[in-house]
Amino acid sequence: MRQAEQSGIVYLADRAIKGLPINFGYYNNAMVISEDELTDNMALNADVILCCKNKTRDYVNTLMREDILKIKTQYPTFNEPLICRKNNWNIEVNGINLVNGLRGIVRNHPDITSIRKDLKEMTIDFLDDGNNLFSQIKMDLQYYRAPQDQKEYLKRNPYNKADKFELAYAITTHLSQGSQYSHGIFMEEFLHRDIMP
């Protein structure tokens, strides 16, 4: 088990698995609050925001980027969190490949000179959460800007070789499996019976 036994996260996870109620309050290194108590500052200071649904993830990413951080450009910016969405086994740094679910931040200052191929690609430097710098990555801007319902088609397009990334202020719990974060926020959502145990 990754979390220490006295961890509030372990305690809360155990209660959730057993179907026991979870009340608002502090649990050692974790706290449970209502959605209306979540502040912009809490969201800004979190390493990641975990959501159960893509729709919520997209909403939170847009909220963080446009409303809280006031980022106006349609392109990723310096220090902005991204997550890789398609494996590229040909790119490796320190034994780590650029794979689906790899999260990190943009480490260069992308400008107009980094955009190419009719505004469909952008060159970025990507620093993953393990401190591995992937330099000069050709990012697929068409995929990055596409609505969720078009992304799967773009991912499977054999003619588009650029690497697929999405915003990652918030990610789904599915993509976070195996990851560790010091300061995360989990947004509880109703899931269909066939998803929950």
Predicted features and spans:
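Conserved interdomain hinge at the start of the Helicase C-terminal
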Residues: V32-N45
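Residues that form generic nucleotide/phosphate-binding pockets
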Residues: L12-A16, N41, L63
